[in-house]
From Swiss-Prot:
InterPro entries: CCA_bact (IPR012006), HD/PDEase_dom (IPR003607), HD_domain (IPR006674), NT_sf (IPR043519), PolA_pol_head_dom (IPR002646), PolyA_RNA-bd (IPR032828), tRNA_CCA-adding_enzyme (IPR050124)
Cofactor descriptive note: Magnesium is required for nucleotidyltransferase activity. Nickel for phosphatase activity.
Cofactor(s) the protein needs: Mg(2+); Ni(2+)
Transmembrane domains' residue ranges: none
Subunit field text: Monomer. Can also form homodimers and oligomers.
UniProtKB keywords: ATP-binding, Hydrolase, Magnesium, Metal-binding, Multifunctional enzyme, Nickel, Nucleotide-binding, Nucleotidyltransferase, RNA repair, RNA-binding, Transferase, tRNA processing
Protein name listed in UniProt: Multifunctional CCA protein
Binding residue positions for CTP: G8, R11, R91, R137, R140
Gene Ontology molecular-function annotations: ATP binding; CCA tRNA nucleotidyltransferase activity; cyclic-nucleotide phosphodiesterase activity; magnesium ion binding; phosphatase activity; tRNA binding
Organism: Pseudomonas paraeruginosa (strain DSM 24068 / PA7) (Pseudomonas aeruginosa (strain PA7))
Family as reported in the entry's similarity comment: Belongs to the tRNA nucleotidyltransferase/poly(A) polymerase family. Bacterial CCA-adding enzyme type 1 subfamily.
Amino acid sequence: MQIYKVGGAVRDRLLGRPVTDIDWVVVGASSEEMLARGYRPVGADFPVFLHPQSGEEYALARTERKSGRGYGGFTFHASPDVTLEEDLTRRDLTINAMAEDEQGRVIDPYGGQADLEARLLRHVSPAFAEDPLRVLRVARFAARYAGLGFRVAAETLALMRQLAGSGELQALTPERSWKEISRALMEPNPEVFVQVLHDCGALAELMPEVEALFGVPQPAAHHPEIDTGVHVLSVLQQCARHHQPLTVRWACLLHDLGKGLTREADWPRHIAHETRGLPLIDAINRRFRVPRDCQELARLVGEYHTHAHRALELRPTTLLELLQSFDVYRRPQRFEEFVAASEMDARGRHGLEQRDYPQAAYLLGAAQAARAVSVKPLVEKGLKGAELGEALKRARLAALKAYKEERGKA
């Protein structure tokens, strides 16, 4: 029985990055032997055990064979005669197919160390093309390590194109797809994830609504980058630079989908793209069974982001309607995330990344002014029901008028 550290822990140590999760592979042992040593079984599909003291995962060395479509279409074979090299060959990338023995020696049968040096994301074997989830995983690794100069190897990108064109991506479950997408959006360069999917044809399969934005022009006066797809990539880049949460990043990815529906004859203007994009946002949210908080913010940002850009010009009545649309009195954080997404949209324009966005402070101040209105004096006057609601609305409108006048004097 031999135990090896494998995968990400070896890769990240060689890169000089913090090692958070450690995976182990056990060669030459059976399930019975693991149980006899006190390991607890947790693997439903193949033999994985938890260490009795550390709680870390130990998997028996195994091979796998394609047996159906999609991420789960594999049969596994785990036994004491499976070698370390056989176990490593089933892994996706060479940089993830290294092991380390108990003396700290690196076992690297597929050139992972050389690819780390060359900053290449390269597949281990042609079996890479059997698992469609690997398209998303490679794009996610590209987003993680772009800052270190990593790029996808040309031959690996070719295999990803093959997978994208095979229809296999459609066999991925919504849950698995969302898990990879959400993790990728939180990487240091989420725009690289989208770019790689675009380059290999997978974006057109998974999110055709986003793919449709590439090549669609916008007015150069407002968008020096012109291309709407390029703009979305820039907005995601700003999200990462400003450490935005997943809700904001997801909303930013989808905020301009309506521009993909504009007739070429109307380019580069995109009148009413906000409302035209809402059915597309709803469709993507359903497709990946996106969590409710991400769904709601994406829809609201899609509908109202241009309101934010024009915030300083909005009448108090329009401003009040905007705040009520967000239920800002009970859910102030959602409005704050909307403002953040709108600011990322404004900053995601080439050459305008550092331009001030006074709309953010103005909108947050307006929300504070409206929320400061107390219902207590109105209740003490004996108002209730619809009459109370109308009186509260008038009081909030008066507060917003006063706020706007005060800001106008500043």
